[in-house]
Curated annotation (Swiss-Prot):
Residues given in the record as substrate binding sites: 57, 73-75
Name listed for the protein in its UniProt record: Aspartate 1-decarboxylase
Lineage of origin: Bacteria, Bacillati, Cyanobacteriota, Cyanophyceae, Nostocales
UniProt PTM comment: Is synthesized initially as an inactive proenzyme, which is activated by self-cleavage at a specific serine bond to produce a beta-subunit with a hydroxyl group at its C-terminus and an alpha-subunit with a pyruvoyl group at its N-terminus.
Source organism of this protein record: Nostoc punctiforme (strain ATCC 29133 / PCC 73102)
Family: Belongs to the PanD family.
Cofactor(s) required, per the database record: pyruvate
UniProt key word ATP-binding: no
SUPFAM superfamilies: ADC-like
Catalysed transformations (reactions): L-aspartate + H(+) = beta-alanine + CO2
Modification type Pyruvic acid (Ser): residues: 25
UniProt-annotated location(s): Cytoplasm
Keyword Cell division assigned: no
């Protein structure tokens, strides 16, 4: 049996743009994607802490060190510039893969600059 757990998240980032005319997705600073281990076009769940919206889209890279977090297409209607977002990916794991597993959490400042990458070793999954 496989279980679905949090794989990684970019925590409390700031929405910097909304482009309703783009085909879809969320643009994320390439450095943040890399540090979180999120691949281009990977499915992500986005939670808008300002309005409670939760939605699924896919990630595309924005220029490295740009601080860009931009909602595109229809998702652009689900936030306004300055809203704080949590961007998450999930993975499927077997019991064997879960031994000593913990998610990756990317912490950023208000301009979406990388502050730290955390591994919650004190919250290891016990199987």
């Amino acid at each position: 049996m496989q279980r679905t757990l949090l794989l990684a998240k970019i925590h409390n980032c700031t929405l910097t743009g909304a482009n309703i005319n783009y085909v879809g997705s969320i643009s994320i600073d390439e450095i943040l994607l890399e540090k979180a281990g999120i691949l281009p076009y990977e499915q992500v769940q986005v939670v808008n802490s300002a309005n409670g919206q939760r939605f699924i889209t896919y990630a595309i890279p924005a220029p490295a060190h740009s601080g860009v977090i931009e909602l595109n297409g229809g998702a652009a209607r689900l936030g306004i510039i300055g809203d704080r977002l949590i961007i998450m990916t999930y993975g499927q794991f077997t019991p064997e893969e879960l031994k000593n597993y913990s998610p990756t959490v990317v912490i950023v400042d208000e301009k979406n600059r990388l502050l730290e990458v955390r591994r919650y070793d004190d919250l290891l999954v016990k199987v």
